[in-house]
UniProtKB/Swiss-Prot annotation:
GO terms for molecular function: DNA binding; DNA ligase (NAD+) activity; metal ion binding. SMART domains: BRCT, HhH1, LIGANc. HAMAP family: DNA_ligase_A (MF_01588). It comes from Clostridium acetobutylicum (strain ATCC 824 / DSM 792 / JCM 1419 / IAM 19013 / LMG 5710 / NBRC 13948 / NRRL B-527 / VKM B-1787 / 2291 / W). The gene is ligA1. It holds the Pfam family HHH_2. Its cofactor is Mg(2+); Mn(2+). This is DNA ligase 1.
């Protein structure tokens, strides 16, 4: 046994030096000899230490991926395309600290920032308890991921055991190196397809039910955060050092005091990008002080204390074959480039955006030309210009003079082309109806794009208000509509008449107004009439509404056809209403609340929204600052921690009693 333990200790030490410190202390051949000897001894003695390097590679094929809930949400980051946006982020953090310190006796430290590489692999979340790896999961939705515990054990530098005995979740990125990709593609089996890029190599490995195949990819990982911990740390840099002390390979970082230092760090990372063994697509800038980060909080989508600066996307060239003109919900006619298929960042691209005719002329883009193609944010293909190596004939791109769908005359507003035939232009009407009926809007259950197309083509629906004139008999004349389906849709349409004001505002399809903006407008103006009459200057006073959005709202309600459509909706019984939460009477007002376990009457999103409507601050973990924990079935560690800290625990039934008591 002692020989086995000695070999495990040595091999883990060698792996740590190789993968974490990037400083090999034995030759590969020597390591392989020791590894084979350990494997032989384990087979002979049937003694297995879970921390043995032989336990990294599984030999099983799983049936399916199980869903798993993360203890805390794994957030995505806000993106910056320009250095000015990074500077604005830094200034925002500085201003926040200054304003906070003016009104609080306990002062926050001057902002420091930690700059790290933005890794381009597959995000993983690894849970440890009592020093053992107990679960690994993909990021998934940020709240629910897929269990990849067995797959993660093939990651060459992921510790199966650590010294720290508490409970932690480690957040990082699984990566395939350039050498591993080259080796994999050089040793393909018959009929196997070569891997196209590093990110897909990593993602495909961890989402493979065949663990042997996962192991072939020889993945590594870098870690950069604790998504959950019972350890008290004051700085983000302390988190990184703690991770390193536990044997995790951490991402390289720089501590910066101001924008100039951050700018230099960004440039330094950009210079080494191409020489790295793994892919990065930018730089992450994050506040170092954890308490300041907590106080800054989150938007709907991302933390306010961090931002990702994106590097310029990779480019390639291809031939532009043709241009297709498509009509959107607003009537805007958008050009789309049809391309000679080309591989870009591991994806075959056949189409790309052209923005508008002014952009086409400015870039001198022509049919038949060879063009520079870029994937903005490595997602959306965009034509950046033409090359000098175009061969053969080229042809000017001409703007259409009539709508390609309905034949109506086109008008130009600014740089964009519009079809003003809102009544009988199929794409406009169908997309408008689908948007109006969508879940975040009027929430008409059972409504689909196919239904909208039939309503337009067979029932001659020419406006949103026509939805409320449809009869059951008319619906039954459509394809696949029988008695029950027709009745259900009629009932859903009728039910939608009683709607929340923010849903109604969003359903109208006001340019540049999403659901959050619609909600902000309702909170500010309280009624639809007030929103409709709001001036440009009143609108820009609303948080997060700038000049472009304000102008869109004013211009929208000025239109005679919009006024007519709204009046028809109201005459047909649509009654949007706004109910302001009386948070002052709620026992949860300004209280920090954590919900845990499975609740009978609420999803995670619903309980969060309910608590926020009652004035509560919803947290993802239990601490001394937590006022209440709402515990459902299988509450787990959060419940245990609440008991240990003496936090007041509410059952779902008690929670609802408290709500009812203040009505």
């Amino acid at each position: 046994m002692k020989l086995i333990e000695d070999l495990i200790e040595k091999l883990n030490k060698y792996s740590y030096s190789y993968y974490v410190l990037d400083n090999p202390i034995v030759a590969d051949k020597e390591y392989d000899i020791m590894y084979d000897e350990l494997k032989r001894l384990e087979e002979e003695t049937e003694y297995i230490n879970p921390n043995s390097p032989t336990q990294r590679v599984g030999d099983i094929i799983l049936d399916k991926f199980e869903k798993t809930h993360h203890k805390n949400k794994l957030w995505s980051l806000d993106k910056a395309q320009k250095k000015d946006e990074v500077k604005a982020f830094v200034n925002k953090c500085v201003k926040f600290v200054e304003q906070y310190n003016l009104t609080h006796s306990e002062k926050l430290p001057s902002p420091q920032f930690v700059v790290t590489q933005k890794l381009d692999g597959l995000t993983i979340n690894c849970s440890y308890n009592e020093s053992r790896l107990i679960k690994s999961a993909t990021r998934g939705t940020g709240e629910i991921g897929e269990d990849i515990t067995e797959q993660s054990k093939t990651i060459l530098n992921l510790p199966n055991a650590i010294n720290y005995s508490g409970e932690i979740d480690v957040h990082g990125e699984a990566l395939m190196t350039k050498n591993a990709l080259e080796q994999y593609n050089s040793n393909l089996k018959v009929n196997e397809t070569p891997l196209k890029n590093l990110r897909n190599g990593a993602a495909g490995a961890l989402r493979n039910l065949n663990i042997k195949e996962t192991a072939r990819r020889k993945l590594v990982a870098q870690f950069y955060d604790l998504s959950y911990t019972d350890k008290k740390l004051k700085k983000y840099s302390e988190i990184l050092l703690f991770l390193k002390s536990q044997g995790f390979n951490i991402t390289e970082y720089n501590i910066c005091n101001n924008f100039d230092e951050i700018n230099q760090a960004i440039d330094n990372i950009g210079e080494v990008r191409s020489s790295l063994q793994y892919d990065i697509d930018g730089v992450v800038i994050r506040l170092n002080d954890i308490e300041t980060s907590r106080l800054m909080g989150y938007t709907i989508k991302c933390p306010k204390y961090a931002i990702a600066y994106k590097f310029k996307a990779k480019e390639t060239t291809t031939k532009l074959i043709d241009v297709e003109w498509n009509v959107g919900r607003s009537g805007r006619i958008n050009p789309t480039a049809i391309l000679e298929p080309v591989e870009l960042a591991g994806v075959i691209v056949k189409r790309a955006t052209l923005n508008n005719m002014d952009d086409i002329k400015r870039k001198k883009i022509k049919k038949g030309a060879r063009v520079f193609l870029r994937r903005s944010n490595d997602v959306i293909p965009e034509i950046m210009g033409v090359t000098e190596e175009t061969e053969g004939e080229t042809k000017e791109i001409e703007a259409p003079t009539i709508c390609p769908y309905c034949g109506s005359e086109i008008v130009k507003e600014g740089v964009h082309l519009f079809c003003e035939n809102t009544l009988s232009c199929k794409p406009q009407m169908v997309k408008s109806i689908v948007h109006f009926a969508s879940r975040k809007a009027m929430n008409i259950e059972g409504f689909s794009e196919k239904t909208a197309e039939q309503l337009f083509e067979k029932l001659n629906i020419k406006s949103i208000s026509d939805l409320y004139r449809i009869t059951k008999e008319e619906l039954m004349s459509l394809d696949k509509f029988k008695d029950k389906k027709a009745s259900n849709l009629i009932n859903a349409i009728e039910k939608s008449k009683e709607c929340d004001l923010d849903s109604f505002v969003y359903s109208l399809g006001i340019p540049n107004v999403g659901k959050k903006t619609a909600t902000d407008l309702c909170k500010q103006f309280k009624s639809f009439e007030n929103i409709k009459k709001a001036s440009y200057f009143e609108l820009i006073l609303v948080q997060d509404i700038g000049s472009i959005v304000a102008k869109s709202i004013v211009d929208f309600f000025k239109q005679e056809k919009i006024e007519k459509s709204l009046n028809e909706l109201f005459k047909l019984g649509v009654k949007p209403s706004y109910e302001e939460s009386e948070v002052s009477e709620s026992v949860f007002n300004d209280k920090t609340v954590v919900a845990t376990g499975s609740l009978q009457n609420y999803s995670r999103t619903e309980i969060k929204e309910k608590l926020e409507s009652l004035g509560a601050k919803v947290a993802g973990s239990v601490s001394k600052k937590t006022d209440y924990v709402i515990a459902g079935e299988n509450a787990g560690s959060k419940y245990d921690k609440a008991v240990a800290l003496g936090v007041k625990i509410l059952t779902e039934e008690k929670f609802e009693e408290l709500i009812e008591s203040v009505k």
